[in-house]
Regions:
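Bacterial N-terminal signal peptides that target proteins for export
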Residues: 1-11
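Bacterial N-terminal signal peptides
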Residues: 9-19
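Sec/Tat signal peptide C-region and signal peptidase I cleavage site
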Residues: 20-24
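Subset of outer-membrane beta-barrel
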Residues: 25-371
Length: 371
């Protein structure tokens, strides 16, 4: 390959990365989606159809609704990983998040760091030392408290930025820090059953996301250009219904069920997204002995992507394991949790396409044992 072809190949890959990883195409036609700001990274939420707006049982629910920080659970810390290596060029792409939440006498606090990384991508077929990495980051600080019995409100402050750097070339993208805010509400009430062996609860939640300052990117290649990008603003509305049962007579066992659903609307669509604003998600979970959870969910999107067909209910599934240290005879109320989810891929015609993506999470809960 000659030098001109090498340069053209590098420029092509550069602009591919500059175009919101894979999806967004311009600052006016599309919002800058599928970043660390809006992608769900926790395996529980993914397997449940990304429908956690009213489910504080999910430790990362405050990513979707700041009022849904886990309540009366002591302290939790977590790490989540979501693969995005759907084809050869994207073999190092990934999302991850780390953070925690805590219940105090003055309310519930949550904090997290989310990141997308393309990994090192070779941008010169003749020089493997020349590569490019695209990274965007979101910092989150959330707070919630009850204002009435069973009624919680919450808010989040976020910082979002992006950088694209090239080793061995002058290509780069930098951005300002965008400061954004979320607000949410959560109502929790007992359901219809109050017997000793069967009880239920119902939650309803809603949130507004990503309102705040302008977001601008500076592109440096052969020329320098500054562009204002639209970050996606969402309205989320949803519910969660939990049914707790005890089965058996002489040998009793806990069997719990959770059903969640969510509607998400893009409030500031770009010129090419005016009819692509409605997202739906739902999930069901069955938990045996409060130890093993099986999950099945799905997402209906107004867009076609590698993970879903437009307008169809696209399934994903997962499993969760809770390991309370009390089973080892320890007196400390500590539980270790592991969650895993699988997302089948819709588009498999690309070079070395995967058939599915995965996500996993590990967390430590202190202050409330599951037993």
């Amino acid at each position: 390959m000659n030098r001109a072809q090498s340069i053209m190949s590098s420029v092509l890959i550069f602009f591919l990365l500059s175009a919101s990883h894979i999806y967004s195409q311009s600052s006016t036609n599309y919002t800058f989606k599928n970043t660390s700001l809006d992608i769900v990274t926790d395996a529980t939420g993914i397997a449940m159809g990304e429908s956690s707006v009213a489910n504080p049982e999910n430790q990362a629910a405050y990513f979707e609704n700041p009022a849904a920080i886990p309540i009366n659970t002591g302290m939790q810390i977590f790490y989540n990983y979501r693969s995005h290596n759907w084809m050869a060029l994207a073999e190092n792409m990934k999302y991850f998040s780390a953070g925690g939440c805590i219940t105090t006498s003055i309310g519930n606090f949550g904090f997290a760091y989310n990141q997308f990384s393309s990994g090192q991508i070779a941008t010169s077929p003749t020089d493997p030392q020349i590569n490019t990495e695209d990274v965007n980051r979101t910092f989150i600080l959330s707070y919630s408290n009850s204002i009435l019995k069973n009624l919680y409100v919450g808010g989040s402050v976020k910082l979002f930025n992006r950088s694209l750097s090239s080793n061995g070339s002058s290509y780069s993208v930098t951005s300002n820090n965008a400061y954004l805010f979320d607000a949410g509400i959560l109502y929790m009430t007992n359901g219809f059953f109050t017997a000793e062996k069967i009880k239920d609860k119902f939650n309803a939640g809603a949130s507004l996301q990503n309102f705040g300052s302008d977001y601008k990117e500076e592109y440096k290649a052969f020329v320098t250009e500054t562009m204002t990008q639209k970050l996606p603003r969402f309205l989320r509305i949803g519910f969660a219904y939990q049914l707790n049962t005890t089965v058996g007579q002489r040998l009793q066992a806990n069997v719990d069920f959770l059903l969640t659903g969510e509607y998400k609307r893009l409030l500031n669509p770009g010129d090419s997204e005016q009819n692509d604003v409605n997202y739906w998600g739902a999930g069901i979970e069955a938990t045996l002995l409060k130890i093993v959870s099986l999950r099945l969910g799905g997402v209906a999107s107004p867009e076609n992507s590698i993970l879903w067909d437009k307008g169809k209910f696209n399934l994903r599934y997962g499993i969760g394991l809770n390991f309370p240290l009390a089973v080892l005879g320890l007196s400390h109320p500590v539980t270790i949790k592991f969650d895993y989810a699988v997302m089948p891929i819709n588009q498999t015609s690309f070079d070395k396409s995967q058939k599915s993506l995965y996500a996993f999470g590990v967390s430590l809960v202190y202050g409330k044992s599951v037993l």
